[in-house]
Amino acid sequence: MSVQFTATALARAVTAGETTPQALLDQAVARAEAASTLNALVSLNEQAGAQAAEVSRRLAGGEALPLAGVPVIVKDNINVSGTRTTCGSRILATYVSPYTATAAQRLIDAGAVIVGKANMDEFAMGSSTESSASGPTLNPWDLSRVPGGSSGGSAVAVAANLTPVSLGSDTGGSVRQPAALTGVYGLKPTYGRVSRYGLVAYASSLDQIGPFARSAADLALLMNVVAGHDPRDATSLEAPARFQAGAPEDLKGLRVGVIRESLGGNTSAVDAALNTTLEALRAGGATTGEVSIPDLSHAIAAYYLIAMPEASSNLARYDGMVYGQRAPGSDVSEVMTLTREHGFGREVQRRIMIGTYALSSGYYDAYYSKAMKVRRLIAQEFSRAFQEYDVLVTPTSPFPAFRRGEKTSDPLAMYAADVDTVAVNLAGLPAISIPAGFDLAEGGVRLPVGVQFIAPALKDELLVQLAGALEGIGAVQLDSPAGYAAP
């Protein structure tokens, strides 16, 4: 019997006895191995078979499992007990986690089977998934192009139909931007909505775990599982919610504000996708208008002057003494120096150096402190915009997937890839990237583009509802790349 390749349909089929967790696991592993050229995964979970058997046992005992047997891939900075967590870095190449992140454990508790770990930019520092010690991940729409980052492996796993859903992390756009460049949904929840316990830290005041999916219903399903308070995460929020995909009638009366500062510098295909989405919203009964976030022009600078100092502090623990690889040396100082020199890649070293400089005596007020003031201003400007509009909209990325190597020698150009996404993290808001169209590149290659919707804090469920409503009126441009159709 053919089952639709969504988490919702697969869980229903397993519960009804139409297929088994082991059969779905075998299928996912076979598809991952067949698509190994994409380099979406860095490892398979050796415990997955035992997880599948446990799901079958629990179902036989009468348990109701919302993710019964659903194969899931998680980013390689989300700890799963007994598996390697490398964060895409040589320094953690042999590190095996002794515990499981709360988000991953909630997936397992709900009946999901974790197939493996997804490739990523080293320590989540990048926008292309090119800096991983395991090599770059390829975009299934065009193998010469990047999938975005830093959660490129998680995005590709869903775009190429290896699994119906996956988890990534978003510090400045690392779920939304690769979702846009690979043509799937990517949701960045409100800061604190999903526990960060067990997520390897990059910038602790910005990091947030979020899901990738191919349907609004699957986003709702995952968020109902992973969201919720966790006493082991001091930033976790007590904010119960019920996520549900919306219907076309939910668009009636919705007030949508287009952020004026996001309208310049986009490719024509990105502008066309945004305009088509706005037309669909108006046809569905929503109203649209423009709104200004004046300090958005300072968001990139403020973001990196906050993220890099936090990274320099968080990554100080990787010194060869406790975690990961250790380089030989004649004394402690030499061991630490060589361990970090050989263990960290070039981009990570760059960000640690800049972050340390920004925190140093005499420069703290000029850089980090000033960036924090800009952060507060941006948050206030978003709050004012939400007094007039229910949601805000921008392109997710000003351009579609770029070629591998195109921006690696120009860090500023790579940082600018996040121009439409970083402000959301600075303000701690929820945002979603929705597949909105395609750019036609040379040779007739279709490259996905995305549109980003932003909601007030703790209104994450509104974004999932909106995604479902747009699906219902045919405004979501979701497809599979050639050679990677759903099973």
Curated annotation (Swiss-Prot):
The keyword Ligase applies. InterPro entries: Amidase, Amidase_CS, Amidase_dom, AS_sf, GatA. SUPFAM superfamilies: Amidase signature (AS) enzymes. Gene3D superfamilies: Amidase signature (AS) domain. It is an enzyme of class 6 (ligase). Its EC number is 6.3.5.7. It comes from the Bacteria. It catalyses: L-glutamyl-tRNA(Gln) + L-glutamine + ATP + H2O = L-glutaminyl-tRNA(Gln) + L-glutamate + ADP + phosphate + H(+). GO terms for molecular function: ATP binding; glutaminyl-tRNA synthase (glutamine-hydrolyzing) activity. Keywords: ATP-binding, Ligase, Nucleotide-binding, Protein biosynthesis. It holds the Pfam family Amidase. One of its GO terms (biological process) is translation. One of its GO terms (cellular component) is glutamyl-tRNA(Gln) amidotransferase complex. Transmembrane segments: none annotated. The active site is at 75 (charge relay system), 150 (charge relay system), 174 (acyl-ester intermediate). Allows the formation of correctly charged Gln-tRNA(Gln) through the transamidation of misacylated Glu-tRNA(Gln) in organisms which lack glutaminyl-tRNA synthetase. The reaction takes place in the presence of glutamine and ATP through an activated gamma-phospho-Glu-tRNA(Gln). NCBIfam families: gatA (TIGR00132). Heterotrimer of A, B and C subunits. Belongs to the amidase family. GatA subfamily. This is Glutamyl-tRNA(Gln) amidotransferase subunit A. It comes from Deinococcus deserti (strain DSM 17065 / CIP 109153 / LMG 22923 / VCD115). The gene is gatA.
